[in-house]
Amino acid sequence: MLLEQLRRAAEQRHALALTRRRRVAHTACAPHQAVGEDGSEPESLLTFCSNDYMGLANHPDVIAALVEGAQRYGAGSGASHLVSGHSLAHTQLEAELARWLAPHIPHACTLYFCTGYMANMAVLTALGTAGATLFCESLNHASLIDGARLARADVQRYPHCDTAALEALLAASTSERKLIVTDSVFSMDGNVAPLRKLLELAERHDAWIIVDDAHGFGVLGEQGHGVLEALGLSSERLIYIGTLGKAAGVAGAFVAAHETIIEHLVNTARPYIYTTAAPPAVAHALLASLAIIEGEEGTQRRAQLTRCIGMLREGLAQLAAIAGWTLGDSETAIQPLIVGDNGAALALSATLEADGIRVGAIRPPTVPEGTARLRITLSAAHTEDDVRRLLDALSAAVAQREVA
């Protein structure tokens, strides 16, 4: 019975062009990567779908630090943080991250997690207790949505970036604990949440803000310290979540907040307590990554990324006008080219791959019905020639469609 039900579900997904499949990377994460199917010979593809925004996943200094960390601390941690798995490398990483966030969160401490999903689940379930209310942005990442579902708090959603609607909800709430929950950079659209206004509302209505800066940490801000640095925000009411497997190029995530909140998470957050700590070598490698992000090389890499974003947007705007597509309103490394139909998005992705370029087609339920898209992501490791090649391939696809 179970297998038959699952087969029918698979058939329905296939009919709606919603089937997902894994590809196999045979080489390191980089703009040019050897990619294949299970059991097939790989082909070299120019890739515009990773979240390695700073191009650090294959950086020699980060790799060397990972090797050094493994030699010093071993391959694994052996236990959870609260048993015997918390190492000097974890402590040093948390201290460095706290230094980064200290100008924006008074009395800041940080807590390192194995994944961003776990960090989001931990914060929402530990703070979203009975009697609390979570005011959730409608386009939040799935991990924030799942965390809200598991929390015992009341959950209220407000429309995308609609601060007036949020203020009405806050004003009407009698909750003893109000928590505004939002992405900073929205993962499928690339636009930035109105955090300055959200902070004003939090202060006015005695609320706190949980900000998931997964796609901003390491990229935004003069030193790459993230969206809070970029916007010049500072408040005790900020609970900040940063991802370390995207721009930082390695793995994991962290929560930065007032020391009292971090102490509460250490003692109550089940995704932190009941799992084996990440390998110390990963934390050691992240220290090298943070040094690059904050230093002169990081500044140069962010400048290169900015150049590529501007070049890509200029070309995509022209193509979208011809093809009837919609280019999302994004100034970040995430550039959504909205095609609309699921099949059309898959076909365009396949056309590009036949030309040696890999761009993922994003479909419901990840995005709303009728907004299937190519999610084009840029890296500081991309060159202007890489961007030009993508634009030329898209232009050829548009011309081919016009002829057909």
From Swiss-Prot:
It is an enzyme of class 2 (transferase). It catalyses: 6-carboxyhexanoyl-[ACP] + L-alanine + H(+) = (8S)-8-amino-7-oxononanoate + holo-[ACP] + CO2. It holds the Pfam family Aminotran_1_2. Substrate binds at residues 20, 141, 366. Transmembrane segments: none annotated. Keywords: Biotin biosynthesis, Pyridoxal phosphate, Transferase. It comes from the Bacteria. The keyword DNA-binding does not apply. GO terms for molecular function: 8-amino-7-oxononanoate synthase activity; pyridoxal phosphate binding. Signal peptide: none annotated. Disulfide bonds: none annotated. One of its GO terms (biological process) is biotin biosynthetic process. The modification N6-(pyridoxal phosphate)lysine is found at residue 246. Its EC number is 2.3.1.47. InterPro entries: Aminotransferase_I/II_large (IPR004839), AON_synthase_class-II (IPR050087), AONS_Archaea/Proteobacteria (IPR004723), AONS_Proteobacteria (IPR022834), PyrdxlP-dep_Trfase (IPR015424), PyrdxlP-dep_Trfase_major (IPR015421), PyrdxlP-dep_Trfase_small (IPR015422). Pyridoxal 5'-phosphate binds at residues 116-117, 187, 215, 243. Pathway: Cofactor biosynthesis; biotin biosynthesis. Its cofactor is pyridoxal 5'-phosphate. Belongs to the class-II pyridoxal-phosphate-dependent aminotransferase family. BioF subfamily. Homodimer. NCBIfam families: bioF. PANTHER family: 8-AMINO-7-OXONONANOATE SYNTHASE, CLASS II AMINOTRANSFERASE/8-AMINO-7-OXONONANOATE SYNTHASE. This is 8-amino-7-oxononanoate synthase.
